[in-house]
């Protein structure tokens, strides 16, 4: 193929077919992809593991399965082991006969087949299904400066922002292809200039803002640009500890889904902001001030798309993206306290907390697991979004504190305190 990109001798040889026709097509796809975004070269993928966004065996993805078979047959498998987004099904999650019929007979009919393909291509292990692959309990945590070939938006924004890795918001399949050849096109967040901020976000709230609400406000304002966030460090204790990482996990997912943010900097907190400070800010950066009134305006702007806006919720999902271990522990305590205050022993709405399989195993090893189970809350490894994609689930009045789930489905957003009141039967 004709191309303008400067390739190394090895890269050009792969493109010319030195490693077979299939590998040449993979390289050609990446070169064409890179040139669309102005990439001038291909750079090595340096992370230990990859992460794939496509984890669900939808019947409609027949072309994907055919492509996967072609890659497997040609020996064009991933040069890295990889994790993948969450599984779409879990029998522990409440669903009726008709929902299960749609899930198993019309939607995810190829799940087992597709997981078999993933294993042949390089899946880390049977538990490597989560959108929060970067958690210690999962083991796919890139180092600062690592070049990645990921595509899951909430994982990309976390890796770029909280870990200081380098990754563009790639698409599904492109993520796998970068891992197969070991190179990705260099543009966007892989470049120093692409990581500079064109927005300054000033946090002037009177209390710690809800991560999912703050992330939503930032995402809708800056869209795909890079924000430099000031004033948030006072609410995060001035350090990047586990609680701060959990907060930024949820904030980032909301910026990425309510907008298209792939990288943000938090002054005095995130690694590049600590290292480079205000030099990350572009000279012509715009300013966005977020105070209590602005967060209320954003909250009030969310549409409620339930057929009956006053319907009693039939299900609550927490964990989009998947919850961390410290979230599971803290929410156990919150639910217990709220139930006691409400005079109830168990949640009054079926409630599901979702987390990575590895995180759930760690949680089960603590005394909190039995305490949470006693409240009636269910834990699961499921992807709530994949559950909500069922047309019959869409018709259900489902509540969540995830702005990502609100954006992509019919689920209704509530703040954490509102969720607690709803699921425990407290006074409104």
Regions found by a protein language model. Name each.
Residues 1-317, 321-428:
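Non-transmembrane, aqueous-exposed alpha-helical and coiled segments at domain scale
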């Amino acid at each position: 193929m004709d191309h303008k990109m400067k390739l190394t001798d090895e890269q050009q040889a792969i493109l010319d077919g030195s490693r077979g026709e299939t590998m040449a097509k993979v390289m050609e796809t990446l070169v064409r992809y890179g040139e669309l975004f102005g990439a001038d070269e291909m750079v090595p993928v340096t992370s230990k593991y990859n992460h794939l966004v496509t984890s669900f065996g939808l019947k409609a993805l027949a072309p994907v399965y055919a492509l996967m078979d072609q890659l497997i047959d040609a020996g064009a498998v991933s040069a890295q082991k990889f994790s993948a987004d969450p599984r779409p099904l879990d029998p522990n999650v409440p669903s009726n006969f008709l929902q299960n019929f749609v899930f198993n007979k019309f939607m995810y009919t190829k799940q087992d087949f597709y997981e078999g393909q993933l294993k042949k291509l390089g899946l880390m292990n049977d538990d490597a299904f989560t959108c929060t692959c970067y958690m210690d309990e999962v083991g796919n945590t890139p180092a600062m400066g690592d070049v990645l070939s990921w595509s899951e938006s909430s994982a990309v924004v976390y890796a770029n922002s909280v870990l200081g890795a380098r990754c563009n918001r790639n698409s599904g399949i492109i993520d796998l292809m970068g891992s197969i050849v070991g190179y990705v096109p260099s543009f966007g967040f892989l470049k120093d200039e692409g990581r500079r901020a064109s927005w300054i976000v000033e946090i002037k709230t009177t209390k710690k803002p809800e991560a999912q609400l703050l992330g939503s406000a930032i995402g809708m304002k800056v869209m795909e640009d890079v924000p430099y966030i000031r004033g948030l460090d006072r609410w995060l204790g001035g350090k990047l500890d586990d609680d701060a990482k959990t907060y930024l996990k949820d904030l980032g997912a909301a910026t990425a889904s309510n907008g298209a943010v792939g990288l943000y900097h938090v002054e005095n907190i995130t690694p590049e902001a600590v290292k480079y400070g205000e030099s990350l800010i572009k000279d012509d950066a715009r300013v966005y001030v977020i105070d209590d009134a602005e967060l209320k305006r954003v909250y009030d702007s969310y549409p409620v798309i339930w057929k009956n806006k006053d319907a009693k919720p039939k299900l609550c999902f927490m964990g989009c993206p998947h919850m961390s271990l410290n979230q599971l522990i803290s929410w156990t305590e919150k639910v217990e306290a709220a139930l006691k205050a409400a005079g109830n022993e168990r949640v009054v709405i079926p409630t599901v907390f979702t987390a990575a399989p590895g995180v759930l195993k760690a949680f089960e090893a603590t005394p909190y697991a039995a305490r949470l189970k006693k409240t009636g809350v269910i834990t699961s490894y499921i992807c709530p979004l994949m559950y909500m994609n069922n047309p019959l689930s869409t018709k259900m009045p489902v509540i969540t504190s995830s702005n990502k789930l609100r954006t992509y489905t019919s689920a209704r957003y509530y703040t954490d305190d509102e969720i607690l009141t709803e699921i425990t039967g407290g006074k409104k």
